[in-house]
Structures are given as structure tokens and as C-alpha cells.
Amino acid sequence: MNAPVVGSSLMVVHDTRCDYGAPVAHAHHAAHLRPPEDDAQQVQAFELLIEPAPAQCQGEVDAFGNWRHRFELVTPHQVLQVRSTSRVTVAARFGGLRPEASPAWETVRERLRYVARASFEPAVEFVQPSPYVPWPEPGLAGLRAWAATSLTPGRPVAEAALDLMRRLHDEWAYRPRSTEVDTPLSTAFAQRAGVCQDFAHLLIGACRLHGLAARYVSGYLLTEPQAGQPALLGADASHAWVQVWCPGTPGVPADGWLDLDPTNRLVPAAGHIRVAVGRDFGDVTPLRGVIRGGGTHSLTVGVTTRRA
């Protein structure tokens, strides 16, 4: 059991509504909405409300160690509403970070290469291409060359990863609604603009194309309103950032994963709540399902993150 976490107490309400053009007779859904717990994050309370009421709902841990809820709906419906409420205490995770003291990136890359009869390194799973970060793909040929500028010979891996994050933030524009969930990564690369999902996938691709392990993080970000302005309910959104494997780096947990937020050009601290990790967005979708019936549908999502 993890020791009590001393840090910021945050409350997150995540509302999802799906309206269908015709009745749904039967549905199975999976949700990644419950935050995990570790030495820097502790869940004080979590509630999941589903309407219509599911015939069954169970929580489980998926292949990547994330909480996942599966539920079945047998009541005919044209509206599905899911609300998760989380109260989480979050502490800064990377105190004393010394990126310049991390191993050379080539040394880390060698640890991730296959060697017969060598012990298995779980981070290897996050070096390979994945559905949202594919290669070889002609439209991403330039991403490898772009990343090489940061990965100079002998450079400490955490220092290189931080430089990639900063360059990505500085050279790409954050542009809401410039891409969709299924927009190819090559489009975001070519137009030099995207949303947080694109920024995360681009940083992941830049690392993997050079043999480094990187994985996608879904979660929430506390966005403080300007002085004198009230927080807008539902104006926040789920957020995405990246973890790069930097083993042996002072200030990074023993598992070696360093969090980087390229959308905001920072190392996540007590304002970021992790929910799930995976190879890319497809592994950590907040809500997905298989339905019988329904016809056309529209999705509405609202997230409110505030201090508890």
C-alpha cells in the first residue's frame, strides 16, 4: 500500500453524453476514467454513474496496469450518459530532476534492443509502432530527421527528451479543432498544428523512430482562471501528454518514466492527474463500445477540474 500523498487535492467531473438516432438494443462499453494510485497520486474518492443503469459493471486492471470499467446495457435507449467524479491528491513527481546526469540516449536505446536470452525489459513494448503512431509512413519521414537535431551523439537521454518537448511546443501551433481523433499523424506533422493528442503522438513518434521508448498518458489538467474570473463549468477537457523512458536519471522514479507535456512545454507537476497509459490514444480511450442499433450518433463531453 502506498504511503499517504501530501499535495494538491483536486476534483474532476467528467461528463459524457451520447445521443443516438435510433434505439440501441444492446451495448457493451469500456471506460478508462478512474485514476490509478502511486507514490505521487492518491484517489480519495471515485464514483461512476451510468444512465440507463447497466445490467452489469465491473472494474478490472488492463494489460498496461490501468483501471478499466466494463459495463453492459440491455435496456433499449437513445441516450447514454456517463459521469465520473474523482477526488485525487497529487504531489509533484519529479523533485530534484537532473536531466544532465541521465545516461546517454544511445545507451538507453541499446538496452531496448533484442538480445537472445537477455532479461525482458517491459519498456520494449513502447518502442514499436502502434495504430496512431505508425511507420514506415512516407508522411512521417521528416519526423525522424527533425528529432535527430536533439539526439546528438552522447547526449543524456532526459536532456534530449526535454529538448524534443520544447522544440515541439515552439515549432507547432496548438490549434483547437484542427484535427479529429482519426486524423493521420502525418497531417499534424505536415500542417505544424494540432491538439494535445497530436502533440503527444508526435513526441512519441520522434522518440520511437530513434529506438527510444515513449508512451501516451491520458489524464486531466488543472487550468486556473485569470484573477477575478470564475472557472467555467465544463470548459476543461481531458488532456494528453507523454512519458519517455529515462532509466537512471536522478529525480525520476525507479520505473524510469519521465512525464513531459509538449502542449504546455513543462514537466507535469501537481496540476496533472494521470488516468491511463498506453501505446497511443487507442489504448486509453475514455469511453468506447460496441452497440446493436443506434444509427447515427453525436457525442458531447464536458470536463471540470478544480481544487477540492
Q: What are these language model-derived features?
A:
Residues V5, F189-A193, A231:
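Alpha-helix N-cap/helix-initiation motif
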Residues M1-Y114:
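Intrinsically disordered, low-complexity N-terminal segments that are enriched in acidic
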Residues A3, R166, D198-G295:
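Hydrophobic/aromatic-rich core segments of domains that either
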Residues C18, A22, A31, L48, ...:
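Flexible, active-site-adjacent loop/turn segments at secondary-structure boundaries
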Residues A104-G194, F281, H297, V303-R307:
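Secondary-structure boundary elements
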Residues A25, H29, D38, A55, ...:
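Short capping/connector residues at structural and topological boundaries
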Residues V61-G65, H77, I291-A308:
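A general structural signal for short secondary-structure boundary/capping elements
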